A protein has these predicted regions:
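A short, Lys/Arg-enriched amphipathic alpha-helix followed by its capping loop at the start of a domain
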Residues: 22-32
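Glycine- and acidic-residue-enriched helix-capping/strand-helix junction motifs
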Residues: 11-19
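Gly/Ala-rich beta-loop-alpha elbow adjacent to hydrolase catalytic centers
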Residues: 98, 102, 107
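Glycine/Thr-rich phosphate-binding loops of Rossmann-like dinucleotide-binding domains
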Residues: 14, 64-66, 107
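Pocket-forming structural segment of enzyme catalytic cores
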Residues: 110-179
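Extreme N-terminal starter segment of soluble prokaryotic enzymes
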Residues: 1-6
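Cofactor-binding loop segments of dinucleotide-utilizing enzymes, especially the Rossmann-like FAD-
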Residues: 9, 39, 101
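Flexible gly/pro-rich beta->alpha loop and the following alpha-helix that scaffold active-site loops
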Residues: 32-97
Length: 179
């Protein structure tokens, strides 16, 4: 199996390492099959999609909905690099999993509205899979209703027409989606 690429953007080592460990544990992958690249400290190199099984993007201190004039130079660079990569990922229908900042980044890239309307404090709300979610391979083996830990300063308010909602919640209507 080709490895997966985990793109991280957390500058503090402790939460960055904890997030990577959580992805390793929950995916069942090992460091050799989930390679981490920390974009807050280095530029994204040229990525050949043929070298990877898929790409994962986790959380961040960055917010996709921050006005451009308030974004740091690092955030602007990271977002420009991710946007270029997402152009290729979406065009190739390449496996991509976004959590937290990864959701906001992909959503903004695809023309969604991401703002603080449906932000959630640290909690574990019930997420309900839609009919599309129940039929989607990414949700295979997941119960129709499950609890998920969340902590979103921002969330998707409106998806573009070509996106499909896979999971919804009472306080945040778009918990999971597919492009």
């Amino acid at each position: 199996m080709k490895p997966f690429l985990f793109l991280a953007t957390r500058s503090d080592d402790e939460p960055a390492d904890a997030e990577y460990e959580a992805f390793l544990k929950r995916t069942g992958l090992e460091e050799s099959t989930l390679r981490r690249l920390r974009l807050e400290s280095q530029s994204l190199p040229q990525i050949d999609l043929d070298d990877w099984s898929g790409i994962l993007v986790g959380g961040s201190p960055f917010n996709a909905s921050t006005p451009p004039e308030k974004k740091s130079a690092t955030q602007k660079r990271v977002e420009a690099e991710l946007s270029g990569l997402l152009d290729r990922v979406v065009e190739a229908d390449f496996p991509f999993f976004g959590a937290c900042y990864g959701v906001g980044t992909l959503a903004c890239h695809q023309g969604a509205v991401v703002d603080t309307t449906y932000g959630e404090a640290v909690t574990a709300p019930e997420v309900t899979l839609t009919e599309a979610g129940l039929a989607d391979p990414i949700c295979a083996g997941v119960p129709k209703v499950f609890q998920a830990f969340v902590a979103h300063k921002e969330a998707v308010t409106t998806l573009p027409p070509h996106a499909v909602v896979l999971g919804t919640g009472e306080a945040c209507p778009v918990q999971m989606f597919r492009i």
